[in-house]
UniProtKB/Swiss-Prot annotation:
One of its GO terms (cellular component) is nucleoplasm. It is an enzyme of class 3 (hydrolase). It comes from the Eukaryota. The modification Asymmetric dimethylarginine is found at R16. Phosphorylated by SIK1 following increases in intracellular sodium, leading to dissociation from the protein phosphatase 2A (PP2A) complex and subsequent dephosphorylation of sodium/potassium-transporting ATPase ATP1A1. This is Protein phosphatase methylesterase 1. Transmembrane segments: none annotated. Residues 268-280 have a biased composition (Basic and acidic residues). Demethylates proteins that have been reversibly carboxymethylated. Demethylates PPP2CB (in vitro) and PPP2CA. Binding to PPP2CA displaces the manganese ion and inactivates the enzyme. Residues 254-265 have a biased composition (Acidic residues). The modification Phosphoserine is found at S15, S42. Belongs to the AB hydrolase superfamily. The gene is PPME1.
Amino acid sequence: MSALEKSMHLGRLPSRPPLPGSGGSQSGAKMRMGPGRKRDFSPVPWSQYFESMEDVEVENETGKDTFRVYKSGSEGPVLLLLHGGGHSALSWAVFTAAIISRVQCRIVALDLRSHGETKVKNPEDLSAETMAKDVGNVVEAMYGDLPPPIMLIGHSMGGAIAVHTASSNLVPSLLGLCMIDVVEGTAMDALNSMQNFLRGRPKTFKSLENAIEWSVKSGQIRNLESARVSMVGQVKQCEGITSPEGSKSIVEGIIEEEEEDEEGSESISKRKKEDDMETKKDHPYTWRIELAKTEKYWDGWFRGLSNLFLSCPIPKLLLLAGVDRLDKDLTIGQMQGKFQMQVLPQCGHAVHEDAPDKVAEAVATFLIRHRFAEPIGGFQCVFPGC
């Protein structure tokens, strides 16, 4: 649920489909596995990557909200992971396994409001201020007055929320900040194209396997391993569908509308409702969140983000899928040494899913360089050239 075209630069809300002419290059090459071999698009449970799951209750003026978190690790600093728009905490699954094997740290991957399995009283409020407060409230609920050292790591929308959280001092024990493929300039440029991208996505899927297959073949996620666990957090069963009779019984072809003879409007309306129900039966999965309806918040997530990021008085890391992502403010800041930057080429917008080992290596090196964490085994830091 989140993807954006290269023509939009960084689809700042969801992850974007493959770069024109290349989306197929990496994923397409992997698709051709020889005669008689089929790729496995079946979903994988979160428990293969995280050690535990917890629903954190937070009291606020609107009532009690419940935030889903997935956790791993028992010592070292906490890496608090914030996903992009439309994604969920499960997008960090493969990265979690990779980083835990490199440095001593604890992982807390959070489903932001209206995403994943988090349940809030006011799910329509996706303002940067509200979501930043959510992050602070979850930290307080989990750790009380003595939170451990925490590094915020966010992808796309989650990166913006991480910056807003840091700049508002909502996490008192914050020691570091990492943004993944989110830059104010390119994000703002992409907003005009975002609705067109969202309209171009499938509205429904006939099974979880179908959703996973689409995410990989469209280039939204270029890593099948990650897609098999991540897409489970992006889609849900359509309302009114309690239990499909299994993916094998679901129609494989595309439902085609029959041409109708002229009839009364009442008859047509009745038939349309019946068609909608049939569509739900045959395509029982849809997106968990309608990103198009969050448009009024997009500007608030990203406007002023570069200066907010630069002003945070803590060590900072910026990971990008391409050097062309940098805007003027960040280019100047990078030249002045205000943050560490690393470019991870041959990735789509979902950098941490497409190249989880490379992202884990970059984050682990950052943690060790600043003496925030201890390496595990024979992990060797690889210092980037930029």
